[in-house]
From Swiss-Prot:
Homodimer and potential homooligomers. Selective autophagy-specific protein required for pexophagy and mitophagy. In contrast to its Saccharomyces cerevisiae ATG11 ortholog, is not involved in non-selective autophagy nor in cytoplasm to vacuole transport (Cvt). GO terms for biological process: autophagosome assembly; autophagy of mitochondrion; piecemeal microautophagy of the nucleus; protein transport; reticulophagy; ribophagy. Its main location: membrane. InterPro entries: ATG11 (IPR040040), Atg11_C (IPR019460), ATG17-like_dom (IPR045326). Residues 525-542, 1191-1201 have a biased composition (Basic and acidic residues). Residues 485-499 have a biased composition (Low complexity). It comes from the Eukaryota. One of its GO terms (cellular component) is phagophore assembly site membrane. Disruption phenotype: Impairs pexophagy and mitophagy. Does not affect non-selective autophagy nor the transport of ape1 to the vacuoles. It is a peripheral membrane protein. This is Autophagy-related protein 11. Residues 97-109, 1133-1166 have a biased composition (Polar residues).
Length: 1201
């Protein structure tokens, strides 16, 4: 009873602890979710900031690059402006602040239109402005990087999670408690006897040894989980506090950085002045061109107005004479006064400011002057384009030049006004040149297509359709006079839809202007909304900041409450630990008192329990094995079914894939031939695709490698030259230093010899004094009476001895120092000699490498030019520039003498004699040779080569996509037509799988059956027993096999066995193994068909079959007998010629088609059907006299249905 009550109480306490743990885990999860939401919001703001900063940084980097370019080159450009001559009669040119210099000279330089002081002042100010702007951008970048790093650190920081696994512990406690409760109820139900008492004792011992300790351990673990949950909750609160504080700091920094990015702007008048320096050449040239344009327009207006006035005056005079003549004739009947004929008066209005007179030669001279200046390539190109536009006709003139193009007489009359003859001639000449270029391109394409058609006719049938139906039928080379006449006629026409198109364009412009105004209003409205939203966001941020402060205060209060609760729980925990220790001691005493009595019973129970567990484990293993086997069997069945379905799908996909491969193979072969005209086409499709990819990649990589190699070679050659000069200067300095050190070494050696001499003298003096000193000491020791003088002498001698010893030490120290210096100088001289040798070796190595690099560059240029020639390009020099063109265009350009004088095919290969530039005798000669070598390399522009290659590859890609699209269209058309024609009766171009109607021929002797046809005779049926043709009038069957045969009567005459029979031989005696089973003429091609009946059960009695055959009887009238003519020799000559033509034809030489060829030929049936239709129509339109002669019409042509 006590155990049950104790277990129930412990279970209730564990449940309370479990609820407390769940509450703490929920609070921890709530805090973690709140932190996650705050971090996600921060990440969103930081991501927006980084995006905005990336855009601002891109803009700032581009601006800084432009500024650096302007700062690096404005002085050079400004100096160049001083060398470019310019006129001074353009007072409106220049900045408003530019002072006007009074000078009598009419010409000056472009620098006169600029203020020199202002330009220099702007150049000095621009450096500071650019550096200040760069520092501002760097500060913003550092701030954004710091914010992103702090945000990432917050995101990566680990957040404490709740405690898991408490549910299992609580379930274990409940299980043990229920076990104790059930055992208690079981004991109460047992009878009171000796056996029952023994069982009860064993049960109580089991509880004491197993259940109660397990229950205590689980309850202690639950208590530990409660403590862990409390610690994690406190840690989550602290982490949330730190995270929120850091998030608030980061957001405040983020707002500052956003304001800095918004204020990141650049406005400077200094750079505007510098940009004016760069733009001045183009602006001045544009003004010159505009002056010429305005002057020519004024002259044209004056001349056209005079011409118009003259023409109208002529019309007025003619009308006046006609009226006088009419009144003279009708004067007796009409009473009216002679009035003057109305006329017009042409006046020019709106005379503008008179611009200075500028001629075209001045513009050309100015452009040529700019070409000689460095860094003026871009203005020269733009000015050249503007100068070319002077001769370009206006839009109205281009329209009037085409007056007769789908126009009317009104258009012609309207275009005849205000259009000078020179303008008309120039427009017509331009149109003619364009049309000639177009015709030449068309002729080239036609020749290529004809060549492709010719090759297709001699090759095997293509795998993906017949492309011959797409070839144009225009002649390969039209007559030039006719073409010129057509182009001149078409150039005088005008489109009748031009006015409607202009109206539509005007309406479109008005509509677009209205949309533009609406969009501007919308933008203004959005700007206002954005400003209001920005203000509201600022207010919201302030509210959020105050809310954060309140939350922080609440968190601090909760933190104090949690500390008080933690201290209370720690006291309770100590009490529980003391109580648990007391209970453990009591249990130990009880267990020790009963341990000796129940030891044997425990061992037997333990053995039985082990056996029971083993039996349960084996049973569970057998059940699991059976379940796994059943599941594995079902899985195998499902897998087999899925594999079967998958195999069917894969077979369908394989058939479709093969069809697609056959269709795309021809397009890929054509693309490969265009990309590599001289190469051999691979057999399979992956090889073709890989070859095309390799060729295109090789072209691009080759271009890129050539460009990189040339750039590296130039840079390395410059670096090697600089290094070589530096090494030569270092070697010269080392020679001078070594000579100076040698002289110093000789001086030091002389001083050392002198010091050694002095040292020897001092040593001899020292020995003398020592001997004297020893003698004195001996005298003193022997007892001689010394006097004061003797003592003073002794003292003096001792002093001299000390001085000499000191001098000796100093001299020895100086000698050692001198010897050390001598050794140091020797080492320096040796090091300098080694350095000089190393420098000489480096110079020689650099020379060798420079020569190898030059040779490599030479080979690269040769390879690039050879590759251009292989691709069909030719390098042409025009106006001193290198242009890469197609060979056909070069031929067209060289057709006239003018183009021959201006352009010619040149070679960009460097001179091989320049490769030895590093072996010059003098440095000046080496510099000249190197510059000549670099100029020869600069003649080949890698950018032009890359553009040509890229354009060529893109053209090939466009052509491949076009052909692929056409192939898909033909494939769809073929599938659609095939599906439509599958259930229809074919009557021409028979192939395997077609449904054909077979009818008996009129040849009753051999009883032959032929397919009903239109323009496709000689398709005979191989009779089989299943057909039962003797009981039928017609047979509807599907063709399964086609055998192509040619009649050769020579074999039958030479002894071939005519009595051979086929397996499916008909009962009427027809042998299909004979050369001529149907008695056809010699050399005739015929076909033997195997067919299976499509709809069994054809009517055997006369019925609809007679109506079907009746037209055949009517249409097949003719005489089997040959019509004799008087000219027998002509007949024999005609027959032999026909026979030779049949035998020598390409179709007769072909053998029977294989099944694969028949399958491939199925894609060409549409083309053959169209050809057959056209042939039939042509033959039907001809008179009967044009039909074949009677000698060629034999019985084989009359035995059809």
């Amino acid at each position: 009873m006590a155990r049950r009550t104790w277990a129930e109480g412990l279970t209730e306490r564990c449940e309370l602890i479990h609820k407390d743990i769940q509450e703490r885990n929920e609070r921890t999860d709530i805090i973690n979710r709140a932190i996650s939401v705050a971090l996600e919001n921060l990440k969103t703001h930081v991501g927006t900031l980084e995006h905005r900063f990336t855009e601002a940084q891109t803009w700032a980097n581009d601006l800084l690059k432009e500024q650096h370019v302007a700062l690096d080159g404005w002085e050079r450009t400004f100096a160049t402006l001083g060398n470019i001559p310019a006129r001074k009669d353009f007072p409106f040119l220049g900045r408003p602040s530019t002072p006007t210099k009074g000078s009598d000279n009419s010409t000056g330089t472009l620098r006169d239109y600029l203020d020199t002081d202002e330009v220099h002042r702007a150049g000095s100010e621009a450096v500071d402005v650019s550096s200040r702007f760069a520092r501002q951008v760097e500060d913003v970048e550092k701030a954004v990087g710091g914010i992103a790093a702090d945000t990432q650190h917050l995101v990566d920081a680990a957040v404490p999670a709740g405690v898991d696994g408490v549910e299992g512990l609580l379930q274990e406690v409940e299980t043990i408690s229920r076990k104790i409760q059930s055992d208690y109820e079981h004991v109460l139900a047992l009878p009171n006897n000796q056996k029952t008492l023994a069982n009860i004792s064993r049960l109580a011992l089991s509880h004491t040894k197993d259940l109660l300790p397990s229950l205590l351990e689980v309850s202690a673990e639950i208590q530990t989980n409660l403590e862990e949950a409390a610690r994690q909750y406190n840690a989550a609160v602290k982490a949330a506090f730190n995270h929120m504080r850091q998030i608030s700091l980061i957001e405040s920094r983020l707002a500052d950085v956003q304001s800095q990015i918004n204020n990141l702007n650049f406005q400077s008048d200094a750079f505007d002045v510098l940009y004016t320096v760069f733009h001045m050449p183009f602006v001045y040239g544009s003004i010159l061109i505009e002056s010429v344009r305005r002057r020519e327009f004024s002259d044209k207006m004056k001349s056209d107005s005079l011409t118009l006035a003259e023409e109208m005056s002529v019309f007025q005079d003619e009308e006046q004479r006609r009226r006088k003549k009419w009144i003279k004739n009708m004067g007796d009947f009409v009473s009216m006064s002679d009035t003057t004929t109305p006329g017009i008066e042409v006046n020019l209005r709106g005379q503008e400011y008179e611009w200075p007179v500028v001629s075209r030669k001045e513009i050309e001279a100015y452009i040529e002057e700019l070409k000689t200046k460095p860094g003026m390539a871009s203005p020269v190109q733009e000015l050249t384009q503007l100068y070319k536009e002077l001769d370009a006709p206006t839009r109205l003139q281009r329209r009037r030049a085409k007056a007769f193009k789908q126009g009317s007489v009104f258009d012609l009359s309207r275009s005849s006004l205000l259009l000078r003859s020179d303008d008309m001639v120039r427009s017509l000449r331009d149109e003619k040149s364009k049309l000639e270029e177009k015709v030449k391109g068309s002729e080239s394409r036609i020749r290529k297509l004809e060549d492709l058609l010719h090759r297709q006719s001699h090759m095997g049938r293509p795998a993906s359709g017949n492309f011959s139906i797409d070839f144009p039928s225009s002649p390969a080379s039209p007559h030039p006079d006719t073409l010129s006449r057509r182009s001149s006629v078409s150039s005088r026409r005008m489109s009748s839809n031009q006015s409607s198109e202009e109206k539509a364009l005007v309406q479109r412009i008005v509509h677009l202007e209205a949309e533009l105004a609406a969009e501007r209003e919308t933008v203004q409205k959005l700007q206002k909304d954005a400003h209001a939203e920005r203000q509201s966001n600022t207010d919201k941020i302030q509210e959020v900041q105050s809310t954060k402060n309140d939350l922080i205060g609440n968190l601090e209060a909760r933190q104090r409450e949690f500390d008080d609760e933690r201290r209370f729980l720690e006291g309770e925990m100590k009490k529980c630990r003391i109580r648990a220790e007391e209970l453990e001691e009591e249990l130990d005493r009880i267990m020790e008192s009963r341990e000796h009595e129940k030891q044997d019973a425990d061992e037997r129970i333990h053995q039985l329990e082990l056996e029971l567990q083993d039996a349960h484990a084996r049973a569970e293993e057998e059940i699991q094995k059976a379940t796994d086997l059943t599941a594995y069997t079902q899985t195998l069945k499902d897998a087999e079914e899925s594999l079967r379905i998958r195999i069917e799908e894969l077979e369908k996909q394989e058939s479709e894939r093969r069809e697609r491969e056959r269709e795309s193979n021809q397009a890929l072969q054509a693309a490969f031939m265009n990309l590599s005209p001289g190469g051999s086409v691979p057999v399979d499709t992956p090889s073709i695709v890989k070859a095309i990819e390799v060729l295109s990649e090789g072209l691009s990589i080759h271009a890129k490698n050539a460009e990189e190699s040339s750039a590296k070679a130039v840079a390395e050659s410059k670096e090697l030259g600089e290094r070589l000069s530096q090494l030569e200067s270092e070697a010269e300095e080392l020679r001078k230093t070594s000579e100076m050190r040698a002289s110093e070494l000789s001086l030091v050696k002389e001083e050392l010899a002198q010091e050694k001499t002095r040292l020897e003298n001092v040593a001899s003096d020292l020995d003398d004094e020592r001997s004297k000193f020893i003698a004195l000491q001996s005298k003193l020791a022997s007892g001689e009476t010394g006097s004061d003088a003797l003592q003073e002498r002794v003292i003096e001698e001792e002093r001299k001895l000390a001085d000499l010893s000191q001098r000796l030490n100093e001299v020895e120290a100086q000698a050692r120092k001198a010897e050390g210096e001598v050794l140091v100088w020797k080492e320096r001289v040796e090091a300098m000699a080694e350095t000089e040798q190393h420098a000489a070796g480096r110079v020689e190595t650099c020379g060798t490498r420079s020569q190898e690099l030059s040779k490599q560059l030479f080979r690269q240029v040769e390879k690039v030019e050879h590759m251009l020639e292989q691709l069909g390009f030719t390098v042409v020099r025009q106006n001193g520039d290198i242009v890469v063109q197609r060979s056909s265009k070069v031929t067209a350009l060289s057709s006239t003498a003018e183009s021959l004088s201006q352009s010619g095919v040149v070679s960009v290969r460097p001179d091989p004699t320049l490769l030895d530039w590093m072996h010059a005798d003098t440095s000046q000669e080496e510099t000249d040779r190197f510059m000549a070598f670099m100029e020869s390399l600069y003649q080949f522009d890698v950018d032009i080569f890359s553009d040509a290659i890229v354009k060529r590859v893109k053209d090939i890609e466009v052509l491949a996509r076009k052909w692929q699209k056409e192939a898909r269209g033909y494939r769809d058309k073929y599938h659609r037509t095939q599906s439509e024609a599958h259930d229809k009766i074919a009557y021409r171009s028979f192939k395997e799988g077609d449904l054909a109607l077979f009818l008996p021929t009129r040849n009753q002797a051999i009883r032959s059956w032929a397919a009903f046809n239109v323009g496709a005779p000689h398709y005979f049926l191989r009779e089989q027993d299943v057909h039962k043709l003797h009981t039928r009038d017609w047979l509807l069957a599907r063709i399964t096999k086609i055998e192509e045969r040619v009649v050769d009567l020579s074999k039958s005459m030479n002894g071939a066995n005519p009595d051979r029979r086929s397996i499916g031989e008909a009962s009427d005696g027809t042998s299909f193994d004979d050369e001529n089973p149907f008695e056809l003429s010699d050399g005739l091609r015929w076909y033997l068909l195997d067919a299976m009946e499509e709809k069994p059960g054809a009517p055997a009695t006369p019925g609809l079959g007679k109506s079907t055959v009746a037209p055949a009887h009517v249409d097949a009238r003719g005489s089997i007998r040959l019509k004799r003519t008087s000219a027998g020799g002509n007949v024999a000559r005609t027959l032999s010629k026909s026979l030779d033509s049949r035998r020598n034809s390409s179709n007769s030489k072909k053998g029977p088609a294989t099944p694969s060829q028949r399958g491939n030929d199925s894609t060409t049936d549409l083309a053959r059907q169209a050809d057959a239709d056209s042939t039939t129509a042509t033959a039907g339109s001809q008179p009967r006299e044009a039909a074949p002669t009677s000698e060629e019409v034999r019985r084989d042509q009359l035995q059809g249905p």
